[in-house]
Regions:
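A short, solvent-exposed, low-complexity linear motif enriched for acidic/polar residues
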Residues: 37-260, 267-271, 275-329
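C-terminal motif of bacterial Sec signal peptides marking the signal peptidase cleavage site
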Residues: 32-35
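Hydrophobic helical h-region of N-terminal Sec-dependent signal peptides
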Residues: 26-30
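Bacterial N-terminal signal peptides that target proteins for export
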Residues: 3-25
Length: 329
């Protein structure tokens, strides 16, 4: 082989080597690109908001009808932010027994920190044993009366889910606002009223108001109810019934004052400023239905002002109260 041929051969070999190296470089670059893209995709997937364990409970504010022994509802599904409680089975609850801070666990789910977007309760026409009705009142005579209407309740309240915490969402199914009676029949109030009748709170951000009245007889009634309002939101018109037959409809929550010891408890009040009002009721015509008698004048034995006091999270406001009679009499 002469020098020219040898040179040409070497040149060809170098060209082939460079071509192969170029191809290898392109292949390695492609592999690295795909790998980086997959990593980026995984990072994007993993950067979604971290979820927090959240327990969901249900409770009730008392119904103020003397002829009602108990109220049952059947919950078939619970959704928060579109997520259903996993493993939830249709449950029939004696909702009227869940007063004075008593709750029943509906289940648990994982939620991202921040404000909830929607909370939905699904009610069933049949009970947990697939017998009807699923939602009903038991009267003092033992009769079971079906509660008409309502299969889905979209709760208007939003709840803040706190990051890195064991959150407890409490749904306050206020029967006093949720039910209406027409003769011997019972039904849920209208959809819009019902949505505003159920509160949703995170118990981590709530407090309690408790109290003792030393002279309930001064209220001159069969039953006295304590109503908690956001400060400045009580008006005289609250004593009149709305279109659904509900009075004190804008109260945040309420509690009957015990006729035997004068005690009352209002639980799951979100931190903030409140005012407290007392109303007297009597069954004037012995029909089992309480009629509003009047507002009760009340004083406290402490420096706490009933027209404006603060409830803080994880705390209790205790009130020692004396009644001085019905207002306006």
């Amino acid at each position: 082989m002469n020098l020219t041929n040898a040179f040409n051969c070497a040149q060809n070999c170098l060209c082939m080597l460079f071509k192969n190296l170029s191809r290898l470089g392109l292949l390695l670059g492609l592999i690295l690109f795909v790998s980086c893209s997959e990593d980026d995709s995984m990072e994007e997937t993993n950067t979604g908001g971290e979820t927090n364990a959240t327990s969901v409970y249900i409770t009730d504010s008392p119904v103020d009808e003397t002829n009602v022994e108990a109220v049952f509802i059947t919950v078939s599904e619970v959704k928060i932010n579109g997520k259903t409680i996993e493993g939830f089975n249709k449950t029939t609850l004696e909702i009227s027994s869940l007063t004075q801070g008593r709750t029943e666990l509906l289940g648990e789910l994982e939620l991202e920190a921040g404000m909830t977007s929607d909370i939905t309760l699904m009610l069933s026409e049949t009970d947990a044993s697939e017998n009807g009705p699923g939602n009903y009142v038991v009267t003092n005579g033992g009769e079971k009366v079906e509660i008409g209407s309502a299969s889905q309740i979209n709760v208007n309240d939003q709840v803040e889910i706190i990051g890195d915490a064991q959150n407890e969402v409490v749904l306050d199914f206020d029967l006093r606002k949720s039910l209406k009676q027409d003769g011997e029949s019972y039904s849920f109030v209208s959809e819009s009223q019902l949505e505003n009748s159920i509160r949703a709170v995170n118990s981590m951000k709530t407090g309690i108001v408790t109290g003792n009245v030393d002279n309930t007889g001064e209220a001159d009634g069969d039953v006295v109810v304590a109503y908690a309002y956001k400060k400045g939101e009580f008006e005289e018109s609250e004593t009149s019934t709305n279109s659904e037959g509900v009075n004190f409809s804008n109260a945040v929550s309420s509690s009957a004052v015990s006729g035997s010891n004068g005690e009352f408890e209002i639980h799951f009040l979100e931190e903030g400023d409140y005012e407290l009002h007392f109303a007297s009721y009597s069954d004037e015509n012995s029909d089992g239905k309480l009629e509003f008698s009047g507002m009760v004048e009340a004083d406290t034995a402490s420096s706490i002002d009933l027209s404006g006091f603060t409830v803080e999270a994880n705390s209790e406001v205790n009130l020692q109260i004396s009644f001085t009679g019905l207002l306006g009499l």
